[in-house]
Amino acid sequence: MTDSKDHHVAGRKLDHLRALDDDADIDRGDSGFDRIALTHRALPEVDFDAIDTATSFLGRELSFPLLISSMTGGTGEEIERINRNLAAGAEEARVAMAVGSQRVMFTDPSARASFDLRAHAPTVPLLANIGAVQLNMGLGLKECLAAIEVLQADGLYLHLNPLQEAVQPEGDRDFADLGSKIAAIARDVPVPVLLKEVGCGLSAADIAIGLRAGIRHFDVAGRGGTSWSRIEYRRRQRADDDLGLVFQDWGLQTVDALREARPALAAHDGTSVLIASGGIRNGVDMAKCVILGADMCGVAAPLLKAAQNSREAVVSAIRKLHLEFRTAMFLLGCGTLADLKDNSSLIRQ
């Protein structure tokens, strides 16, 4: 990678943050949750205050099944502040957190500070993050181990973003034979590898490739939330290049991705972990995802503005999600996550 491209990567991360602030239509609001109608219980037969939302993830106990999804990598004071606020907020609220892409730290050593977060979140799961396509661009086991080490991570996201790479003029588009390279990383790193999309959804075929590679953790990251394709279009805003706009609604909606994933993982019940993300905006959306089989729910956009503010704002936003999730469980008559999980009887037919 050239110095020019390194600088471009760092600048692009800040461009992404600005685009999220400037364009309300980047949040597509079409993940499919409106298609899921739940059955209200006027006599729920549970004590609200006794509802148990606790769960475990990657060997650590959480207050409820929330993962702060990857938001931003890069370097600079603003990004460092966002990541530290998120990590400290995750620790106080007892939820998991994933960082954004760590690719930049391999070309800009100062970027490591953005990912040195374990001191801020000593007891909750932290996930490192590398773009899977970078395994075809010179990154390998050494870099994956370094990404895990700086974060003292409990797991490693390998993210799949073919659409985002396709609409970037500087994108890395060689996705050939990644399955074998993912398998080698999954075999050789000391923590679980999690395969995730970034907003277009994992299909059953993608999950099958992941399973053959030894992956047991999948984040469907479906369509309907933040459109990275639209962000790339906005970042350039060239009249002769509307590729990102054309593909802004490409992919599997989150609801459909979850429904594909469950049967694909059926043979691995008890050993596989399914994470829902993509347009989850409140605790009711989270409840719907768990009903559809998700073990964890990834949320990013609802926490970004809070993270730009303070740790306290992050904690407040997480507690709001937790209250909404607990209230949905109460109104469905569910006292535990086991009552909610994979329970299609809660969906009105």
From Swiss-Prot:
Q: What is its main location?
A: cytoplasm
Q: Which domain of life is it from?
A: Bacteria
> Which positions does UniProt annotate for Mg(2+) binding?
E165
Which cofactor(s) does the record list? FMN; NADPH; Mg(2+)
* InterPro entries to which the protein is assigned, alphabetical: Aldolase_TIM, FMN-dep_DH, IPdP_isomerase
Write out the catalysed reaction: isopentenyl diphosphate = dimethylallyl diphosphate
Which keywords does this chain's UniProt record carry? Cytoplasm, Flavoprotein, FMN, Isomerase, Isoprene biosynthesis, Magnesium, Metal-binding, NADP
Q: Which parts of the sequence bind FMN? A: S69, S70, M71, T72, S101, N129, K196, T226, G279, I280, R281, A300, A301
The broad enzyme category this protein falls into is isomerase
Name the Gene Ontology biological process terms: isoprenoid biosynthetic process
Q: What are the binding positions for substrate in this chain?
A: R12, K13, S101, Q102, R103, Q164
Q: Which Pfam families match?
A: FMN_dh
E.C. number(s) listed in UniProt: 5.3.3.2
Location relative to the cell: Cytoplasm
Q: What family is it from?
A: Belongs to the IPP isomerase type 2 family.
Q: What does this protein do?
A: Involved in the biosynthesis of isoprenoids. Catalyzes the 1,3-allylic rearrangement of the homoallylic substrate isopentenyl (IPP) to its allylic isomer, dimethylallyl diphosphate (DMAPP).
Q: How does it assemble?
A: Homooctamer. Dimer of tetramers.
Identify the PANTHER family for this entry.
Answer: ISOPENTENYL-DIPHOSPHATE DELTA-ISOMERASE
Tell me what this protein is called: Isopentenyl-diphosphate delta-isomerase
Name the lineage. Answer: Bacteria, Pseudomonadati, Pseudomonadota, Alphaproteobacteria, Rhodobacterales
